[in-house]
Amino acid sequence: MIEILVITISNPLLIGIYENKKLIKEYKLDGKTSDVLPTLFQKLLNHYNIKRIIYVNTPGSFMAIKVAYIFLKTACLTKNIELNAVSGFEFNNNSPIKALGQKYFINETNNLKVDFLEKDCIICDFKLPLCIEKYNFNKETLPIYNLPAV
């Protein structure tokens, strides 16, 4: 079974191709989600028989999450592919994620807060896991916006 994991809340964008839950190919792409995702997915949809797409729906760049959701939801509906979502904290060792200005999303025992970082805080890069078997993907795929509208 082919599954694709899409992380658009970081730069570069990370896209992993998984066969039987194991990573077989990864893409690290610089650029805007709206430019990069359609070009890559045109190739992926022609090359693989994709059964499921998983994308990061929280927290991070609202625009990147929104664009990814609309694009992936449309692709999944038209190609009859299952869409799931997952938190970005799963792929950066639960490290703070850039929010707005100098503030970051911080996950404290499943309680999300937005705050400034402490001086000794370490930020981890996002990484595609070698295996996606242990992750608990969510069938509720709407983007989760953690900041109020400005």
Describe each model-derived feature in a short phrase.
Residues 1-39, 46-47, 83-150:
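Oxyanion-binding and handling regions
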Residues 40-41, 62:
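Short secondary-structure capping micro-motifs at structural edges
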Residues 60-61, 118:
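Short, structured coil/loop segments at alpha-helix boundaries
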Residues 28, 58-59:
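Short, contiguous strand/loop micro-motifs
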Residues 52-57, 63-83:
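DPxDG-like acidic metal-binding loop motif
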